[in-house]
Structure formats: C-alpha cells, structure tokens
A protein has these predicted regions:
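Asparagine-centered strand-capping/turn motif at beta-strand->loop junctions
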Residues: 37-41
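Low-complexity, acidic Ser/Thr/Pro/Gly-rich terminal tails and inter-domain linkers that flank the onset
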Residues: 1-27
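Short glycine/serine/proline-enriched coil/turn segments at secondary-structure junctions
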Residues: 23, 44, 91-95
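Short acidic, flexible loop segments centered on an aromatic residue
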Residues: 43-62, 103
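Short, solvent-exposed loop/turn segments enriched in Ser/Thr/Gly
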Residues: 28-34, 97-98
C-alpha cells in the first residue's frame, strides 16, 4: 500500500494487476487501483478535481485532468473517508502513476493534496533496480 498525507488528509492507494483484462500478445495490461481518502483534520473539505501523470515502462507519459473522481466530488467531514476503485490500461507490462487532488474548504480555500506515486507491475514485468 502507498500512502501520502497533506494537511491532515491521508490518501492511500492499493494497485492490483487484472490478468483477465490483460493480454501480453496484444500489448495490453490493465490494473485496478483502490484509493481511500481520509480527512483527519478539523475542517470539512470537498474534492473538486484530479490530475494524474501516468508513465509506462517506455517512459511515455499521459496526463489526465478532470472534475472529481468516478463521477463524484465527495465531501469529507472531520473523521470521514471516501473510497473508490478505478482502472488504468498500459501498453507495457509495468509503469507508475502519481497525482494530485484539488480540494476546497467550506470557507472557499482551495489547496492541493498529493496522491502517492504508485507502481503498476504485472507478472510479465522485469524488475529494474535504480
């Protein structure tokens, strides 16, 4: 599990390779990832936008920006959490993702929180030590 905390908001990510939606012969690899956002602060916040950078094993990057996550802009009161699962395809057997969410407080203050960089590894990927 991958974890980042910004302004008392914790984001955890758990990626999972999905073999039944992947085909090495067609250079298609698919992962699901489950994200849990927990508000440990004292203010109610709302997730407004997402910004992802997805990088495959060849170094190709894809940038994804949009409103909310999975069609929602969740509101998190103090102590509340929001969990969702989404997915990502790549044409290589491994890669990684990183990102940010834009949040807004009840008073209208906007700020960004980090989504931890997380690895997308399939059984076909070769381990590389940097």
């Amino acid at each position: 599990m991958y974890r980042a905390v910004t302004r008392q908001i914790e984001v955890t990510v758990e990626p999972n390779f999905v073999p039944e939606q992947s085909s090495a012969d067609r250079s298609r690899y698919f992962w699901s990832y489950t994200i849990v956002i927990t508000n440990s602060g004292e203010e109610t916040v709302q997730l407004k936008t997402r910004h992802w950078i997805i990088t495959d094993a060849s170094g190709r990057q894809q940038e994804v920006k949009g409103e909310g996550v999975v069609g929602e802009q969740p509101i998190l009161g103090p102590g509340e959490r929001f969990e969702y699962t989404s997915g990502v395809p790549l044409s290589t057997a491994s890669g990684f993702m990183t990102g940010r969410y834009q949040m807004v407080t009840e008073s209208g203050e906007r700020f960004e929180i980090d989504v931890p960089a997380f690895s997308l590894d399939s059984p076909d990927s070769k381990r590389v030590l940097n």
